[in-house]
Amino acid sequence: AVKTDAFRHPDTVAASVSEDASRLLWDAELLLRKVYDIHGSDSESVDIIEYYDFDALKRQRRENYRYMLEHCPKSDAYTIVFPYLDDATVPSHFTLYAADRGKFKEYLSQNGIHATSYWPVGPYINLEGHTDCAYIYDHVISIPCDQRYTAEDMAYICRVLKDF
């Protein structure tokens, strides 16, 4: 017999697909619940989720970013990617375009500053004719400014940037 929905009434096909999708959804949901039950969660993680002061998190991130914007020295070695902080943004990183990212990242590392280079060019990505994209891939670097850091940390980063 030919297994095709071409000769079945559309309502029957839709019902069948809907039933299959529903069954898959609930199978996946039950599997996730089993995984959660097996691994559970520790009380500290539950407390963090239930009681964490997210307003303080947002405030600290914004203060750190604002500090970097106000105190980061101008340099030919890098350009600030997002030079304005609007009211809705809660950044986790201070992102720059570095003229020589490798040298810049190594310098930061030598001074105890972790910086991240995101988005490596994948093997199937062709940047030919996309010079703006290629520039971003080759130059973007991010320095964390999240709630773990203080104004003193941001001041240290700015001093290190000044000496680059």
PLM-predicted stretches and their roles:
Residues V2-F164:
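PLP-dependent aminotransferase class I/II
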